[in-house]
Amino acid sequence: MANKKIRVTGAEAEQPSILKRISGALTLNPLDYHLDYSKLISLNFMVKISFHDASDYDLFVREGITPVELFEALASNWSTDSGEVHYVDGNTHDKDEIDTSVKLCELITIIKDLPFHKSEESTHFSILSTSLTLGFGDQILQKHDNSVIPIITERSLPQYMHAIIQYEYPRVSGGIAATICAGICIRSPPIGNCPPIMKPLHLELLCYHYGLKMSGDAPSPAEGKIGRIKRPTERKEDTPSMTKRLKGGVGATISRMLSWKE
């Protein structure tokens, strides 16, 4: 994760509008702020936000949403220590330098209400249909809302896998998909005052359970549309990783895998 922050500073003497001040961030070059991931993710712009629990997050918003839609929604919840809205300009300042603070639960609500457009089949890393990716830092030590379950992957997920993930993890539907990391992880509840535990969940397990391939091939015509993908009832002979169908479905098995009881 890049350590460089996008900073916010005080308003100019002319007192430009909130939207103009905030939308100035759109002129930033993503390569300046997220060198590792900007080449992997197709982004229109990036905004870095420091939340109320002092953890740093990168908020990635991909193709489909207009600057006006995003920043008008954020404007009413945009807060600073000084009580006035400041704008993001990407520069380093010696005076009046603060980080923008938005509560995580409020931001989730705002993003869910925005009219996102579906990305094209060729664009990847849009795990949920909202095309929203929230990147968590290397360490998450503060308590968070139990309803927030990040899914993390470094693979280019085929479009049809989005519906499968949402089907298996309904708590993620309309929630947040986290950014690039090794494998898929889901934060294990309950969180409470304890640090969340990230345990690996392999894409291969989901793909096997649905008879799909990791190569990105779409389901065969016999498997029907995305919403009606059927689970295999028998183990494929060329898949030695499992010996029988999982009782209760892959969702129940994964829930047991992610249990806090070892």
From Swiss-Prot:
One of its GO terms (cellular component) is membrane. Most abundant protein in the virion. The gene is M. It is found in: Virion membrane; Host endomembrane system. It comes from the Viruses. Residues 219-243 are annotated as: Disordered. Homomultimer. Interacts with nucleoprotein and with the cytoplasmic domain of glycoprotein. GO terms for molecular function: structural constituent of virion. It is a peripheral membrane protein. This is Matrix protein. The lineage of its organism: Viruses, Riboviria, Orthornavirae, Negarnaviricota, Haploviricotina. Keywords: Apoptosis, Host membrane, Membrane, Viral envelope protein, Viral matrix protein, Virion. Plays a major role in assembly and budding of virion. Completely covers the ribonucleoprotein coil and keep it in condensed bullet-shaped form. Inhibits viral transcription and stimulates replication. Belongs to the nucleorhabdovirus type-1 matrix protein family.
